[in-house]
Amino acid sequence: MQRGFSRSIDPVIPQEITITRVAIATEEDAKKKNTEKGRKYIIPYGLYRCEGYISANLARKTTGFSEDDLKLLWTAILNMFENDHSAARGKMAVRERIVCKHDSELGNAPAYKLFDSVAVQRKPDVYDARSYLYYTVTVADTLPEGVTCERLS
């Protein structure tokens, strides 16, 4: 299993916010009654696309990656932000997986053609997207022979 780096669909603009820490961490802090100030950078909203590959041929010959492993991987990807909430990640969530499968172990089409068949676009009447609902995700109606795509949420 290989995954590329995620890229934002639209440009993202980090915003700097000031934070104040009021928690007393040591006895000395309690005596001084100090607070700490700092800065934090956030991205108010971003929709990211990540692409990945699984080689059925390598799974059979080398790694032993199985359908059970794939099911476990999908569960982990879907829940990767659910069990590790953090102010740093806000409300990050996996929204959709589009999975292409080949009839042939070596593949029926190059990966780039399949990635190109998936389009993510901001809706025309939206200037600043602040929700997944502001985007349209489409998969081409015509795929290479021997390839199927399934949309999983």
Language model regions located:
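Basic polyanion-binding and macromolecular-assembly surfaces
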Residues: 1-153
